[in-house]
Amino acid sequence: MDALVMAGGRGTRLDTDGEKPLSPVAGRPLIDYVLDALDASGVASVVVATSPSTPETAAHVSAPIVQTPGEGYVADLDAALADDRLARPTLTVAADLPLLTGAVLDRLRRAHESGSLTVAVPAARKHELGVSVDTTFDHDGRTVAPTGVNVVGGEPSRTLVVDEPRLAVNVNRPGDAAVAREWLRS
């Protein structure tokens, strides 16, 4: 399975002067943690999706780049997935998950059976950790939040809910960065 890192967002909620994927957490850029996790996983290859908003990120990474139009997550995802270097199913990972590990990614890849997979965590877990919850949806009577990790394949599409703190901490706001720093230092 190939992997696509989504690294084209402006990161306006993070309130940083620089590009979000390069925002430091515990002394390292966010995207470096994600790329290290992918390197430690069993993915076949990694492509990074950047946009006109993230030229320094494109220069920073050594992985192949696909330039997207910077028109929002869904439009950029569609543009990136059209790149012929990515075979379906494709593991997609947001660049703002500094606690991610290769072992967690491999568990998710093994959980993928066919089609597409949306990976979510209980919203209650995010609240317990003290990180922001911007989007939620109901799944089997539980309020869950998307993690920023998915498998894009086709139909059928299913949701996998995992109570994994490493997937619950995505850095969208300054408080999220503080929580991630504490985890990385412990």
Question: Where are the model-predicted features located?
Answer:
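N-terminal nucleotide-binding beta1-loop-alpha1 segment
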Residues: 1-18
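Generic beta-sheet signal
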Residues: 3, 88-91, 117-119
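Short beta-strand/turn micro-motifs composed of small residues
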Residues: 7, 50, 94, 120-121
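Active-site glycine-centered loops adjacent to acidic/histidine catalytic or metal-binding residues
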Residues: 9, 96, 173
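Short, active-site-adjacent cap segments at secondary-structure transitions
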Residues: 13, 54-57, 99-100
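Short glycine-enriched, charge-decorated loop/helix-capping segments at active-site entrances
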Residues: 18-24, 166
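Conserved N-terminal catalytic core of the sugar/cofactor nucleotidyltransferase
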Residues: 24, 30-94, 137-139
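Conserved core of the sugar-phosphate nucleotidyltransferase
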Residues: 60, 100-186
